[in-house]
Amino acid sequence: MKKIRNFCIIAHIDHGKSTLADRLLGATQTVTAREEKAQLLDNMDLERERGITIKSHAIQMEYKYKGEEYILNLIDTPGHVDFSYEVSRSIAACEGALLIVDAAQSIQAQTISNLYLALENDLEIIPVLNKVDLPSANPEEVSDDIIDLLGCKLEDIIHASGKTGFGVENILAAIIEKIPPPKGDPEEPLQALIFDSVYNPFRGIEVIFRVVNGEIKKGQKIKFMATDNEYFADEIGTLKLNQVPKNVVSAGDVGYLISGIKEAREVKVGDTITDAKVPTTNMITGFEDVKPMVFAGIYPVDTEDYEDLRSSMEKLQLNDASLVFTPESSAALGFGFRCGFLGMLHMEIIQERLEREFDMTVITTVPNVSYLAYTKKEPEKALIVNNPSDLPEPSKLDRVEEPFIKATIITKADFVGNVMSLCIEKRGLITNQTYLTTERVELNFDMPLAEIVFDFYDRLKTVSKGYASFDYSPIGMRTSKLVKLDVLLNAQTVDALSALIHEDNAYNIGKKMTEKLRELIPRQQFDIPIQAAIGAKIIARETIKALRKDVTAKCYGGDISRKRKLLEKQKKGKKRMRQVGNVEIPQEAFMAVLKLND
């Protein structure tokens, strides 16, 4: 146990976590030169393409230091704000963390938020200054920033470069010297924390865990404490680049377990594994469920694929503990699910993974957040509104509360004005402004979460020329003037396009929505009115003109009554068509409504 070190890597997006992890694997000869490729641990195609880490990955390395063999368990974590739960999960399984800061970009908002997560869990922090070989690197200034943030000494900061491999030996030495070995007693009853699970179509669910106390043996009967289900440990082992089966995994180590579990619901991340015969009395605490921030409907394009979609979602949920979904139905789209996501990036990723890994083509509706509505009848009782169609009628409504967040934005001093006006346009309230250095400013805003859901992140990057970084944490519900905006096509409400928005923006959004839909819905044989309404009041209207046949073409001689007869006949036909005709909405129309401000 004294020779084990568990650590994770935390950093802002693109500060070089995955590349540095590759170098560590190379230096410890965990991977041969032949297996080496960039972003070795990002094994989803999607992660490679976007160059981001989505899942945390665990891998074991062996390293000789001063003549002794050490076992290092590395857990690579994502840097994006949407995936901070992945980070918190990995942090729970470690004793130390490498805090990586890009020498060119300095400290960003997420560096700080992930650092606080690590400090709350009492991890030993090793600061690493990455990318020092870049011509634009500014190591002296950035070192000062790190010292201000951590209160460490200048000589504690390790200079490194993931690209060239410079400084990797120093990092490994620091991990062994500074990070404490895991605490725990191999003699006590088994107690292990599940921090990840993966679905394997042939072998069922692979559970990835870290043993806190005791040891787990092959063939032992074990129990999951949250569900009280018992299983046999058919195969256990440690994780190198591939799985290495072992007969016993003891306290302090990270390993995997296969016991032929097929049901996704039986494995809960954050659960405790214990021995079925001699169970431990207490569960491992300090692991809370993630709360989804953004809700959207996901529907199969073909209603018959509903069951396939359900099983695909369950398999995704295994690998992604933060995805929540409940069945719902919509008049326009049939049966589907209302899903909760951590943010817009998460929603896009889930949609892409459904398409890639499970061949499901899905329609997503307008994303929204979760509101609380109070009626005049019972002003004390809160109704949870995840779907705009659940909102009570305006006449019965007393008030609506929406979730607010505290946003921290770090930007260059030149862009403060732009960032402020963007936040104020999004109904933000500035609470604090501090200059970290003469160049960098930290702004704090209280903002409604709903305003961030759409395109806030992209627009923030645009107004700050890519320099601003952004992080947020929820601060509770506040009362707001919200209205439900309905879209009517051919006088019928399309429930999938409804949205809850602030009263002041209603007219603008309604107008934009109708204009956008007019461009995207194909013309029919009859006029289609597109209306935006609040309750019974229509606030904007556009009409898609009918395609018409020239019925008078065959009349030569120009007798007006003959022409009129044919035109009247056509008019009657169009009227009848309009009564029975229904309008198909293409998927592009749903997606375009989300991106109204472009």
From Swiss-Prot:
Q: Cite the GO molecular-function annotations of the record.
A: GTP binding; GTPase activity; ribosome binding; translation elongation factor activity
| Top EC class of this enzyme | hydrolase
Where it sits in the cell: the answer is: Cell inner membrane
Swiss-Prot/TrEMBL keywords: Cell inner membrane, Cell membrane, GTP-binding, Hydrolase, Membrane, Nucleotide-binding, Protein biosynthesis
One GO CC annotation: plasma membrane
Q: Which reaction does it catalyse?
A: GTP + H2O = GDP + phosphate + H(+)
Identify the domain of life. Answer: Bacteria
Q: Where is it predominantly found? A: membrane
Membrane topology listed for this record: Peripheral membrane protein
* Residues in tr-type G domain copies: 2-183
Keyword Amino-acid biosynthesis listed: no
Question: What Pfam families does the record tag this protein with?
Answer: EFG_C, GTP_EFTU, GTP_EFTU_D2, LepA_C
Signal peptide segment: none
Q: Where does GTP bind?
A: D14, H15, G16, K17, S18, T19, N130, K131, V132, D133
- EC number in record: 3.6.5.n1
Q: GO annotations under biological process?
A: positive regulation of translation
- Function of this protein? Required for accurate and efficient protein synthesis under certain stress conditions. May act as a fidelity factor of the translation reaction, by catalyzing a one-codon backward translocation of tRNAs on improperly translocated ribosomes. Back-translocation proceeds from a post-translocation (POST) complex to a pre-translocation (PRE) complex, thus giving elongation factor G a second chance to translocate the tRNAs correctly. Binds to ribosomes in a GTP-dependent manner.
* NCBIfam families xref list: lepA, small_GTP
Which family, according to the similarity comment? Belongs to the TRAFAC class translation factor GTPase superfamily. Classic translation factor GTPase family. LepA subfamily.
What this protein is called in its record is Elongation factor 4
**Organism classification, top ranks?**
Bacteria, Pseudomonadati, Bacteroidota, Flavobacteriia, Flavobacteriales
